[in-house]
Amino acid sequence: MAGLPPLLLGTYTPKIDAKGRMALPAKFRSQLGQGLVMARGQERCVYLLPFDEFRRIASQIQRVSVGNKAAREYLRVFLSGAVDQQPDKQGRVLVPQMLRDYANLGSDVVVIGVGTRAELWNKDTWESYLAEKEEGYSDIADDVLPEVEF
């Protein structure tokens, strides 16, 4: 896998402080520490994307958006809520109020690694989501990953 960036993996529980700042998990700083884009994610989470991954996704959506109304609408919502961030010397980023409202983020949050991106979740929402999805985990794998051998 030479040339590929390390995957973002794991589950972390940082806090969002009174100023809206959150410390990036130390293991994510090599991929996100030079800058990242925060954007509205699916299921009311916030995506934390390395710049290159954000550009790749936005470019793919833009290629289909001109003639596809749903793609245009998705692109508008996705890009209008996207914010580029530079972590400070302590590895903290400001989570904008708009995104905190979107994902119902208070001080207790969860950051999960999802391969090429991280996701920022309300702690209670994540725990409920995970509990619900873990029940059908094996069934989902059969449908989504039919060619992957474990």
UniProtKB/Swiss-Prot annotation:
It is found in: Cytoplasm, Nucleoid. GO terms for molecular function: DNA-binding transcription factor activity; transcription cis-regulatory region binding. Residues 11-53, 82-125 form the SpoVT-AbrB domain. SUPFAM superfamilies: AbrB/MazE/MraZ-like (SSF89447). It comes from the Bacteria. GO terms for cellular component: cytoplasm; nucleoid. Pfam families: MraZ (PF02381). InterPro entries: MraZ (IPR003444), MraZ_C (IPR035644), MraZ_dom (IPR020603), MraZ_N (IPR035642), MraZ_sf (IPR038619), SpoVT-AbrB_dom (IPR007159), SpoVT-AbrB_sf (IPR037914). Transmembrane segments: none annotated. Keywords: Cytoplasm, DNA-binding, Repeat, Transcription, Transcription regulation. GO terms for biological process: negative regulation of DNA-templated transcription initiation. Belongs to the MraZ family. PANTHER family: TRANSCRIPTIONAL REGULATOR MRAZ. This is Transcriptional regulator MraZ.
